[in-house]
Amino acid sequence: MSKNLLIELGLEELPAYVVTPSEKQLGERLATFLTENRLSFEDIQTFSTPRRLAVRVSGLADQQTDLTEDFKGPAKKIALDADGNFSKAAQGFVRGKGLTTDAIEFREVKGEEYVYVTKHEAGKPAKEVLLGVTEVLSAMTFPVSMHWANNSFEYIRPVHTLTVLLNDEALELDFLDIHSGRVSRGHRFLGTETTITSADSYEADLRSQFVIADAKERQEMIVEQIKTLEVEQGVQVDIDEDLLNEVLNLVEFPTAFMGSFEAKYLDVPEEVLVTSMKNHQRYFVVRDQAGHLMPNFVSVRNGNDQAIENVIKGNEKVLVARLEDGEFFWREDQKLQIADLVAKLTNVTFHEKIGSLAEHMDRTRVIAASLAKEANLSAEEVTAVDRAAQIYKFDLLTGMVGEFDELQGIMGEKYALLAGEDAAVATAIREHYLPDAAGGALPETKVGAVLALADKLDTLLSFFSVGLIPSGSNDPYALRRATQGIVRILDHFGWRIPMDKLVDSLYDLSFDSLTYANKADVMNFIRARVDKMMGKAAPKDIREAVLESSTFVVPEMLAAAEALVKASHTENYKPAVESLSRAFNLAEKADASVQVDPSLFENEQENTLFAAIQGLTLAGSAAQQLEQVFALSPVINDFFDNTMVMAEDQALKNNRLAILSDLVSKAKTIAAFNQLNTK
């Protein structure tokens, strides 16, 4: 008869960002534990709040399934001595399995007999197996952990309670310094310690103590309450998904409410107000029906609506202090001169091993000028790039960015416009930080994109040059994100800038502040980001083939990978790749100094292939270019069927290899076809 299992771990307040991943991890680890221990179950449901992680298993078998295993031992000739008795080898084998020689039987495998024993293990009761479930809790991993009291162990937060129930029976076990029971804790202020009656009554028992254990239910409550406020007040609330996920992990019993602030603060840039509310106070932003910011906010209380007016006033007071700061900095920063702030950047360290921000900007300016030419920017855009590169970090020394560092670049754009800078320059100051996340927004202007590329390239080359190279998952300077940004920007704008040649040219530059080094490591790092950008849709062999192409032009490489993936599902892919692969492999033996001499052709197939290669222009999209190369497959096959490439005559051999080398030099601009797998 199946049962339901409940495990709840009661802890001190968890960081909000840890709650959801830990809830998921607990469920996955318990499922693995049960499967490995042969305890079948129907379903697993997880729960979490800031002060607990829990999981309930439904339909858990009351005992393990029986286990029958066959074990192969030594060959019969080794298992028996001269007298036909079991040898020490055979006796040791069965003893290691907990059996006797009576269990031995011989089975023939590939013409020879071997010792076999069959071991039967009866399943243990679930209750007995579950005594080891603390292994699941011990194996949990967290981004941070801590010691408490005089204990030698560490965990994400101090553990206060452990509840393990099999239906309504409490199992006795120990974890860290806690003995399990059926006592859980209610809401910190509204509830008390409570007894969990059974695994099935878990949610109801906690609800009576003002705890909503199901995170999804808490989220639905928050959204429903906000929607009610929208209708009652005739407003729109920005329900930011990330903020919602954070807030639901800050509360155990949510109650949403609306507060207000003086309309005078709306004169401060919207980004400042939104940052103050959303990032610093975890408030939802309120707008009118036209989408304009209103002097209101929505927050979520960890509790019921008792004395809610006092809660609203308290939250309003805290927010006003933030808004006062924003208003002050907005007013005072406008008195500053951009030139003065830029001059002071010589005293701001970019990194102690690399130098100042001013030096970083100087290098970026040189790189930006080179990129502007490569990207064929107009004269006006080139001028804007140069001006932006001279000043683009100035806002880091403003009071606003000092207080709200999330606004770097955003405030730079606003202050630049107020100072009379060209709009393209101001926009580039904001856009040079983009993308600021893996799937974040990209620059929309060419000027901003070039500045972003230049800034990221110098950052990458500078850190690599002083040996600060990411290893494993460790990337404290976000160089992977910066390089992924380089790849995404190049692809987005379709700039066909050969990265290998670009990086070579950057390493030829001379700066007093820094000498670029470790070029090979930089190129491998960029290749790894292009590889990642190709995505899971492209199999490993296709990614490797594209990465080994003769051109390192990001948009073309990504397009080639996509085209190869689509082509791999067609009928002519296998024969085309196989003929090209044969050509690639033979071409490796070609003498690079030998040019094709048509006078040495001995058959029509040589002439036909050479003419086809000469006519191969590889125009159009990556898919069209691939189609043009694949169209040569019959011609290549005819050539191989009628021509001895590795002829005894050295001149003929070299000439035929030269034909293939010409083919490969063109085809390899798409991919190294001999790296593709057709099996």
From Swiss-Prot:
Subcellular location per the Swiss-Prot or TrEMBL entry: Cytoplasm
Any one of the GO BP annotations: arginyl-tRNA aminoacylation
GO cellular component, one term: cytosol
Keywords: Aminoacyl-tRNA synthetase, ATP-binding, Cytoplasm, Ligase, Nucleotide-binding, Protein biosynthesis
Keyword Methyltransferase: no
Species this protein is from: Streptococcus pyogenes serotype M18 (strain MGAS8232)
Subunit structure: Tetramer of two alpha and two beta subunits.
PANTHER family: GLYCINE--TRNA LIGASE, CHLOROPLASTIC_MITOCHONDRIAL 2, GLYCYL-TRNA SYNTHETASE
Family: Belongs to the class-II aminoacyl-tRNA synthetase family.
Pfam name, any one: tRNA_synt_2f
Cross-referenced PROSITE patterns: AA_TRNA_LIGASE_II_GLYAB
Top-tier EC class: ligase
A molecular function (GO) term: glycine-tRNA ligase activity
Keyword Transcription regulation appears in the UniProt entry: no
Identification of the protein by name: Glycine--tRNA ligase beta subunit
EC number: 6.1.1.14
Catalysed reactions, semicolon-separated: tRNA(Gly) + glycine + ATP = glycyl-tRNA(Gly) + AMP + diphosphate
InterPro entries: DALR_anticod-bd, Gly-tRNA-synth_bsu, Gly-tRNA-synth_heterodimer
